[in-house]
């Protein structure tokens, strides 16, 4: 399945190249492309592979921060790096590599799950028994020049499975708690499991978030004020071609399958699922 997905993405990439060539032939500039990468855990044994991915990123795109309001230049290639769940191995294994290359990143924090072994659904392959999320002290010491923090709710709740008042509490209180922890404004929010709807978007706007992130692998930041931003799932274990295609936006065809999976999760998730 992974190889099949990569081959479809390669076809998308080739089609993009043909389209851009035709635009140049007719005197038009290529469209800007930006992708937001969604990482989770970066284990020590994966640091070298992560570093190689960051080398590819700076060669193929210009890094941007998740809070940017920059208008993308026609023909430009851009990438944003994010990490969900605030695993502490990011500190030792990801931040040094990001700092070397001057790549900004956003870490999405689950405010009531700090300093503990993850007990929610494990998406990644790098978690070990002693894996923990960052503590409040570790969050406060993250270099603000390089790292911004966003909310990922209090409990990693699937918000679409909660009643709206409970979901509102997860969204609003996580922002308030995180701001109190680090004494900095929290402007971004990331939906656990990528599950959201229009009502939740309204709650996020009312709570004061300036941008929210999903797991739909679409091209991002087409407008400076874009509120709902998609991301593509990446992992240090990705094959090089696989990562290059994700970086080029080749996986955006996966938007429909991702939405289908989210719909099925909503159908089968128990009420008040965590």
Named regions from a protein language model:
Residues 102-124:
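A short, conserved beta-to-alpha structural element at the edge of catalytic cores
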Residues 116-119, 157-162:
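A short acidic, helix-capping loop that chelates divalent metal ions and anchors anionic groups
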Residues 37, 42, 148-156:
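Histidine-centered catalytic micro-motifs
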Residues 111-114, 153-155, 233:
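Short, flexible active-site-adjacent loop segments at beta-strand->alpha-helix junctions, enriched
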Residues 1-82, 87-93, 161-274:
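C-terminal active-site subregion of NodB/CE4 polysaccharide deacetylases
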Residues 17-24, 124-144, 173, 217:
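Alpha-helical scaffolding within the catalytic cores
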Residues 106-111, 147-152, 214:
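Non-cysteine beta-strand/loop elements that form the S-adenosyl-L-methionine
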Residues 29, 53-62, 96-103, 132-151, ...:
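Acidic (Asp/Glu)-rich catalytic clusters
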């Amino acid at each position: 399945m992974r190889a099949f997905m990569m081959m479809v993405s390669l076809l998308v990439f080739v089609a993009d190249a043909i389209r851009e060539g035709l635009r140049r032939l007719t005197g038009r500039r290529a469209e800007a492309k930006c992708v937001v990468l969604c990482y989770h855990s970066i284990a020590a044994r994966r640091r070298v592979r992560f570093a190689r991915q960051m080398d590819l990123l700076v060669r193929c795109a210009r890094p941007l921060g998740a809070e940017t309001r920059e208008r993308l230049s026609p023909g430009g290639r851009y990438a944003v790096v994010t990490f969900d769940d605030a695993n502490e191995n990011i500190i030792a294994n990801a931040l040094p590599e990001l700092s070397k290359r001057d790549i900004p990143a956003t870490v999405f924090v689950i405010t009531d799950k700090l300093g503990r072994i993850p007990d929610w659904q494990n998406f990644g392959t790098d978690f070990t028994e002693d894996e923990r999320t960052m503590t409040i002290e570790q969050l406060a010491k993250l270099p603000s020049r390089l790292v911004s923090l966003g909310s990922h709710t209090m409990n990693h709740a699937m918000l679409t499975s909660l009643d709206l008042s409970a979901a509102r509490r997860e969204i609003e209180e996580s922002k308030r708690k995180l701001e109190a922890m680090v004494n900095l404004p929290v402007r971004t929010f990331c939906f656990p499991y990528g599950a959201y709807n229009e009502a939740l978007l309204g709650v996020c706007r009312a709570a004061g978030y300036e941008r929210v992130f999903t797991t739909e692998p679409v091209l991002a930041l087409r407008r400076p004020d874009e509120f709902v931003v998609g991301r593509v799932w990446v992992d240090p274990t990705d094959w090089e071609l696989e990562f290059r295609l994700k970086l080029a936006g080749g996986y955006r065809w996966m938007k429909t399958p991702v939405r289908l999976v989210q719909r099925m999760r909503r159908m089968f998730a128990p009420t008040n699922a965590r």
